[in-house]
Design a protein with these regions (language model features):
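Short beta-strand/loop motif that positions the catalytic acidic residue
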Residues: 179-181
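Post-His helix in hydrolase/transferase enzymes
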Residues: 216-232
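Flexible "cap/lid" loop of the alpha/beta hydrolase fold
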Residues: 76-77, 81-123, 159
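Conserved acidic catalytic loop of the alpha/beta-hydrolase fold
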Residues: 39-55
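Active-site nucleophile elbow and catalytic-triad environment of alpha/beta-hydrolase enzymes
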Residues: 150-171
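Gly/Ala-rich beta-loop-alpha elbow adjacent to hydrolase catalytic centers
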Residues: 58-63, 67
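Conserved HGGG/HGGXW glycine-rich cap/lid loop of the alpha/beta-hydrolase fold
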Residues: 1-37, 55, 73-76
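Conserved loop-alpha-helix segment in the C-terminal half of the alpha/beta-hydrolase fold
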Residues: 183-210, 216, 228
């Protein structure tokens, strides 16, 4: 099962879904609400409860925080795959993992996001949309400009609450994990991802180059790592 990240939707997994289906696997990509880590994780957890095991659970970006929580206590989840993703420990927030060298830390918020209020928001929370120049130059910078522009135009907003909610679980402590790290990721940087992967004891694959959207630009490379996790479950 595949869980997308912020400023994206299930279509970000199109390449992986097609490849895995062609290989004969049952695949689902769930719509991540992008509202609050606790409720987003509960939503994905409820979806997981409808799927027979064994399950390989894959998360991209903020989706990594979601799978870290959603998999907790589910015996059918036998492997976790983090794709340019966050893997928080209990009490940590997704927003703390971009890395000091991330563009999210190097630019002021007003240069990164367009902010919009939304109905039912927790006090102080707003929805964030990545600005066009940030999306094209730093988020999906290895994609053709036409593709990146289309993805920017169709991005799903993420609430600030999603990034500020502390993680309640750390499923990687008990479930084997794999980590796909793009050396060219400017959002959750390779330095930060390597530290999380080492802490989790993950099997690590480093992709030379790419961006935060390597899952779209090079789905075959990401699929290879997902297959490694699948193979471990089948042994």
């Amino acid at each position: 099962m595949l869980v997308h990240g912020a400023w994206a939707d299930t279509s970000s997994w199109d390449g992986e879904v097609s490849a895995l289906m062609q290989l004969g696997y049952s695949v689902r990509a769930v719509a991540n609400p992008l509202e609050n880590l606790t409720t987003d994780s509960e939503y994905v957890s409820a979806f997981l409860d409808t799927i027979p095991g064994p399950i390989v659970l894959v998360g991209h970006s903020y989706g990594g925080s979601v799978i870290t929580n959603a998999a907790a206590g589910n015996p059918n989840v036998e492997a976790l795959v983090y794709v340019d993703a966050a893997a928080p420990a209990v009490g940590e927030t997704n927003g703390s993992f971009s890395g000091a060298d991330s563009v999210l830390k190097r630019k002021p918020e007003d240069e990164l996001f367009d902010k919009l209020p939304y109905p039912g928001a927790p006090p102080g929370a707003v929805e964030l949309y990545l600005r066009k120049d940030v999306f094209l130059d730093h988020f999906g910078n290895d994609l053709p400009a036409e593709v990146a522009t289309r993805l920017w135009a169709t991005q799903r907003a993420a609430s600030t609450s999603a990034f500020e909610t502390p993680s309640r679980f750390a499923a990687w402590e008990t479930i084997p994990s794999w980590y796909f790290i793009s050396s060219g990721d400017q959002i959750i940087t390779a330095t930060s991802e390597r530290a999380m992967a080492e802490r989790a004891g993950s099997h690590v694959t480093v992709f030379d180059g790419g961006s935060h959207l390597t899952l779209i630009s090079h789905p075959e490379a990401v699929t290879d790592v997902i297959e490694q996790a699948i193979d471990s479950v089948r042994q």
